[in-house]
């Protein structure tokens, strides 16, 4: 069973549900999906939300190894994504890079816009968006204790100051394809609406919007027995 945690934000609830559906619909291996919700982390996550935290899960994502009991492997994903791949591929990658502490897509880019969804500030820093898809080898991420996550700076967390560089494995960049930053790619495996997704009026015609709306329709479907 592969445990998957999806960041949950109260202003993007539909994004969580569509992403979860897109994963379940394509996976040929057992996956367990859980929302990473601040309201469920009382007593574990104690810090106040900072002005540069654009989502409710900006920093709670780094609690995934602790929430997993520092055992096994766990996946974290931002909610503003659409899965177009079988998660069996992630399991295979875990097998190939079992010596690493965390696997990420190593983006090297500068954001094209100073603002993103809901007019929020686009913070620029090294290793931007590496943390939006993380595959944790939980036993090797014990530095991410609740005490550390509650006290470390956001930049130190997102820039992976908690792990040695040689322990950061690399995933194909197509597994976190940045919509609005990268050109359209028919082979993208996980589409990331990092500037804003089609559930926001401003981005309803963004790249891959039609695919997302189709996934929403499929998620809403229920066959009624008569």
Residue ranges and their predicted role:
Residues 31-68:
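Active-site-proximal specificity loops/subdomain of glycosyltransferases
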């Amino acid at each position: 069973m592969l445990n998957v945690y999806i960041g949950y934000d109260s202003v993007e609830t539909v994004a969580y549900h569509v992403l979860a559906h897109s994963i379940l619909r394509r996976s040929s291996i057992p996956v367990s999906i859980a929302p990473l919700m601040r309201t469920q982390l009382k007593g574990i996550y104690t810090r106040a939300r900072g002005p540069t935290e654009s989502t409710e899960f900006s920093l709670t994502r780094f609690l995934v190894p602790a929430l997993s009991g520092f055992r096994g492997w766990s996946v974290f994903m931002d909610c503003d994504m659409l899965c177009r791949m079988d998660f069996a591929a992630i399991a295979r990658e875990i097998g190939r890079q079992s010596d690493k502490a965390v696997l990420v897509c190593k983006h090297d880019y500068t954001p094209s816009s100073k603002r993103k969804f809901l007019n929020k500030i686009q913070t620029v820093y090294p290793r931007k968006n590496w943390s939006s898809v993380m595959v944790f080898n939980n036993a090797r991420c014990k530095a991410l204790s609740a005490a550390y996550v509650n006290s470390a700076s956001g930049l130190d967390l997102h820039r992976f100051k908690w792990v040695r560089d040689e322990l950061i494995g690399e995933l194909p960049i197509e597994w976190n394809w940045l919509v609005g930053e990268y050109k359209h790619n028919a082979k993208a495996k996980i589409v990331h609406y990092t500037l804003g997704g089609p559930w926001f009026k401003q981005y309803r015609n963004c790249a891959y919007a039609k695919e997302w709306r189709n996934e929403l329709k499929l998620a809403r479907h229920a066959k009624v027995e008569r």
